[in-house]
Amino acid sequence: MITQKEKEHLAKDKQNIYLRIISGIVLVSLFVVAILWFKTLFYILMILVGLGMLSEWCNMTSSSIHYLLIGFIIIPIPISLLIFLSTQESNRLVIMLYFCIIWSVDTFAMIGGKTFKGTKLAPKISPKKTWTGLIIGTISAGLIAVLVSLIPYYHIENYYFSNKIYLFIISCILALIAQSSDLFISYFKRKFNIKDSGHIIPGHGGVLDRFDSIILTAPVFFGINIYL
């Protein structure tokens, strides 16, 4: 028998998933429009994201100057790298792919974990994450990247992103790093005893909760674009 409390918890989880999906669609749509057609808007969005992440980081780590200063290193760097890459017209489609990858792994890892359960990935840091969710999220991100690249007139100049096999492999690697980045920030949230960094994005929490994956993935993504 399921208790009333458990029913309420399940209903809340279901509502949270719907909110997460809806707000995710809105965010993705906004960023796709900005990346493809309004470069200046993308710059503004990324600066606002960076400021939002820094604000939430400062609120979270205000009791420790050492941890507070870490945020002024790990947040501006990925934001700056993504803005720099976007200045090149040839990178706009690849950047769109990048956001599709890091956001799809997060969404499908959550759906996969809640649907199929399984062994906990890092119970002390992020109790809801599972190995099953990680695998489903990673593979889904790779497949979505390939599917998006099949859109007619969708031409990518970078060979490693235009080749479907390489794209799938790179996408899976970025997806795994995105989940590692998520756990990295979750470690600090646990350390300072907070669940969400904020509540500005429905279903996601704060800006840091939604964009934490760029902290580790953006430098890798930048390296791939520059050196491959």
From Swiss-Prot:
Catalyzed chemical reaction(s): a 1,2-diacyl-sn-glycero-3-phosphate + CTP + H(+) = a CDP-1,2-diacyl-sn-glycerol + diphosphate
Gene Ontology CC terms, in alphabetical order: plasma membrane
Enzyme class name: transferase
EC number: 2.7.7.41
Pfam families referenced in this protein's UniProt entry, alphabetically: CTP_transf_1
Transmembrane segments: 31-51, 65-85, 93-113, 131-151, 165-185, 206-226
UniProt keyword list: Cell membrane, Lipid biosynthesis, Lipid metabolism, Membrane, Nucleotidyltransferase, Phospholipid biosynthesis, Phospholipid metabolism, Transferase, Transmembrane, Transmembrane helix
One GO process term, biological-process aspect: CDP-diacylglycerol biosynthetic process
Pathway(s) where this gene product acts: Phospholipid metabolism; CDP-diacylglycerol biosynthesis; CDP-diacylglycerol from sn-glycerol 3-phosphate: step 3/3
GO molecular function, one term: phosphatidate cytidylyltransferase activity
InterPro entries xref list: PC_trans (IPR000374)
Source organism, top-level taxon: Bacteria
Family as reported in the entry's similarity comment: Belongs to the CDS family.
Name of the protein in question: Phosphatidate cytidylyltransferase
Encoding gene per record: cdsA
